[in-house]
C-alpha cells in the first residue's frame, strides 16, 4: 500500500522534478523501459511505448501537447517519434503569443540524436489539418547548448484562413507586425 506522496517507480530527483513540471497524462501500452542509476544519477535509459491521448504541459522551449497518439522510442543517445492523432493540440508559448494550436488531424515522423549538449532533430514529415490551415512540413532543428537553437523548416500550405495569420507570427516578428 502506498500513500499519494509515495512513488511506485524509483526515479532520480531531476526526473521527479520533470514529471511534476510537465505533468504527463494519457494511456501507454506495450511499454518497455530500462535504466541504470549510479547513486542518484540516471546514467543510461531506454524506453519504447505506444501512447494514446497523451498530454503534457509546456516548459521553456519544450512544447506542450494534448490528445496525441503514436509511438516513441528513445535512449540517452537518440530517439524516434511517430504521431497519428485526430483531434489534438500543441502549445508553443516560447514561439507564439497565441500558443495553443488545435488540429483535426496530426501525423508526424521525427528522430533525434544527442551528443553531449548538442541535440539534432529531424522532422521527416508532418501533416496537419485544423480550422485555420492544412498542409505538410519537414525540416531539422539543432540545439548546441546555448540559445534557442537553429531551425530549418520547409512547409507547404494547401489551405489557410488569411484572417488567422496573425496567430502564427512568432514573438520574434513583434507586436506591430501581428497587429497590422
Task: Report the location of each language-model feature.
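Extended amphipathic, helix-rich lipid-handling scaffolds
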Residues: 1-59, 72, 84-133, 148-180
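Short, low-complexity, polybasic intrinsically disordered segments
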Residues: 64-71
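Short beta-strand segments at enzyme active-site cores
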Residues: 81
Amino acid at each position: 500500500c502506498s500513500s499519494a506522496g509515495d512513488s511506485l517507480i524509483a526515479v532520480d530527483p531531476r526526473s521527479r522534478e520533470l514529471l511534476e513540471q510537465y505533468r504527463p497524462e494519457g494511456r501507454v501500452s506495450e511499454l518497455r523501459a530500462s535504466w541504470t542509476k549510479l547513486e542518484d544519477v540516471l546514467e543510461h535509459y531506454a524506453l519504447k511505448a505506444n501512447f494514446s491521448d497523451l498530454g503534457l504541459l509546456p516548459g521553456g522551449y519544450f512544447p506542450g501537447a494534448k490528445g496525441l497518439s503514436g509511438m516513441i522510442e528513445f535512449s540517452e543517445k537518440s530517439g524516434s517519434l511517430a504521431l497519428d492523432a485526430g483531434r489534438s493540440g500543441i502549445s508553443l508559448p516560447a514561439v507564439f503569443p497565441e500558443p495553443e494550436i488545435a488540429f483535426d488531424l496530426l501525423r508526424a515522423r521525427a528522430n533525434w540524436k544527442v551528443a553531449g549538449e548538442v541535440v539534432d532533430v529531424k522532422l521527416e514529415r508532418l501533416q496537419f489539418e485544423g480550422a485555420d490551415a492544412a498542409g505538410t512540413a519537414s525540416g531539422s532543428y539543432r540545439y548546441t547548448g546555448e540559445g534557442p537553437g537553429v531551425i530549418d523548416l520547409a512547409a507547404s500550405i494547401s489551405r489557410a484562413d488569411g484572417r488567422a495569420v496573425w496567430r502564427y507570427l512568432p514573438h520574434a516578428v513583434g507586436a506591430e507586425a501581428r497587429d497590422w
